[in-house]
Amino acid sequence: MRKLKPQKRQVLADPVYNSRLVTKLINAIMYDGKKGLAQSIIYSAFEIVEQKTGKPALEVFNKAIDNVMPIIELKVRRVGGSNFQVPTEVTPERRQTLGLRWITLYARLRHEHTMIEKLAHEIIDASNNVGAAIKKKEDTHKMAEANKAFAHLRW
């Protein structure tokens, strides 16, 4: 067993927006280590966001992430041969990770032509409290509410 918990590594802020959250989005979008391609996708998507909304892209993106981040999630716990979905609070770090993961996942599943358009529209939708990523958050919260009776099984 470990003696100490490993230290969390901080990602560097991206050069254009000077934001760690944007760097995390770049890392979430990136496939096969192609960071340059991921950066160009995100910066182009942010340009589209600015054109469509007329607001700074970083502001819209931060609002989208805040809207998507879940407060409660379900964890499966086995008690006496039965599996229970136990609602648990989400740590701030995990909330951010889940928010970014859901935005990238549902952007990829959209039916626009390019990933740039898909990501831009998913960010705009999330900032307006609509879209698939918001629906995922609401479904998670609904399931947690339905399983509230098992909250005493928390560990």
UniProtKB/Swiss-Prot annotation:
Role played: One of the primary rRNA binding proteins, it binds directly to 16S rRNA where it nucleates assembly of the head domain of the 30S subunit. Is located at the subunit interface close to the decoding center, probably blocks exit of the E-site tRNA.
Range of residues in the leader sequence: none
InterPro entries: Ribosomal_uS7 (IPR000235), Ribosomal_uS7_bac/org-type (IPR005717), Ribosomal_uS7_CS (IPR020606), Ribosomal_uS7_dom (IPR023798), Ribosomal_uS7_dom_sf (IPR036823)
Keywords: Ribonucleoprotein, Ribosomal protein, RNA-binding, rRNA-binding, tRNA-binding
Keyword rRNA-binding tagged: yes
One Pfam family matching this protein: Ribosomal_S7
GO cellular component terms attached to this protein's record: small ribosomal subunit
The protein, known as: Small ribosomal subunit protein uS7
Family as reported in the entry's similarity comment: Belongs to the universal ribosomal protein uS7 family.
Naturally occurring in which organism (per UniProt): Ureaplasma parvum serovar 3 (strain ATCC 700970)
Keyword rRNA-binding applies: yes
One GO BP annotation of this record: translation
GO molecular function, one term: tRNA binding
Subunit structure: Part of the 30S ribosomal subunit. Contacts proteins S9 and S11.
